[in-house]
Amino acid sequence: MSAQVSLELHHRISQFLFHEASLLDDWKFRDWLAQLDEEIRYTMRTTVNAQTRDRRKGVQPPTTWIFNDTKDQLERRIARLETGMAWAEEPPSRTRHLISNCQVSETDIPNVFAVRVNYLLYRAQKERDETFYVGTRFDKVRRLEYDNWRLLERDIVLDQAVITSHNLSVLF
């Protein structure tokens, strides 16, 4: 990461991310989509445990995409949720997106900032189904006119190597 940003800018970006998280928790998916840049890359790969000796050599085992979505693909996912026919979300999940350890830095692109946060996504569904997703997110946000912001990239890294939930229909 490059140079750190001012406290004011850090605060503004953090507030944007907190607002975005609340939109997801409140199932305001269309409002959330409006926060995404047209060029959004929304990605998550499988987590693979690598041996220490391999990590020291810079060798990483191959991974598989879980998500590698564009804005159009995210819009289709949301449209499916809105139909009431997405059985993975009937009844709808109750979620809480918690983000912390927010680090913001400049990039080589004007008005684009790199953000690293740790997250905990709690998901409750039905009477007894509970899942915790924990990890790190690497986001890029773009500053527009009038201090508006758009999410340009989101790379989600799960700490869990095995996903124990029934599905991954929630948004991070």
Curated annotation (Swiss-Prot):
This is 3-phenylpropionate/cinnamic acid dioxygenase subunit beta. It catalyses: 3-phenylpropanoate + NADH + O2 + H(+) = 3-(cis-5,6-dihydroxycyclohexa-1,3-dien-1-yl)propanoate + NAD(+); (E)-cinnamate + NADH + O2 + H(+) = (2E)-3-(cis-5,6-dihydroxycyclohexa-1,3-dien-1-yl)prop-2-enoate + NAD(+). Its EC number is 1.14.12.19. It comes from the Bacteria. The keyword NAD applies. The gene is hcaF. One of its GO terms (molecular function) is 3-phenylpropionate dioxygenase activity. Transmembrane segments: none annotated. NCBIfam families: 3PPDioc_HcaF (NF042947), PRK10069.1 (NF007479). It is an enzyme of class 1 (oxidoreductase). GO terms for biological process: 3-phenylpropionate catabolic process. Pathway: Aromatic compound metabolism; 3-phenylpropanoate degradation. Part of the multicomponent 3-phenylpropionate dioxygenase. Converts 3-phenylpropionic acid (PP) and cinnamic acid (CI) into 3-phenylpropionate-dihydrodiol (PP-dihydrodiol) and cinnamic acid-dihydrodiol (CI-dihydrodiol), respectively. The keyword Oxidoreductase applies. The lineage of its organism: Bacteria, Pseudomonadati, Pseudomonadota, Gammaproteobacteria, Enterobacterales. This dioxygenase system consists of four proteins: the two subunits of the hydroxylase component (HcaE and HcaF), a ferredoxin (HcaC) and a ferredoxin reductase (HcaD). Signal peptide: none annotated. Keywords: Aromatic hydrocarbons catabolism, Dioxygenase, NAD, Oxidoreductase. InterPro entries: 3PPDioc_HcaF, HcaF, NTF2-like_dom_sf, Rng_hydr_dOase-bsu. It holds the Pfam family Ring_hydroxyl_B. Belongs to the bacterial ring-hydroxylating dioxygenase beta subunit family.
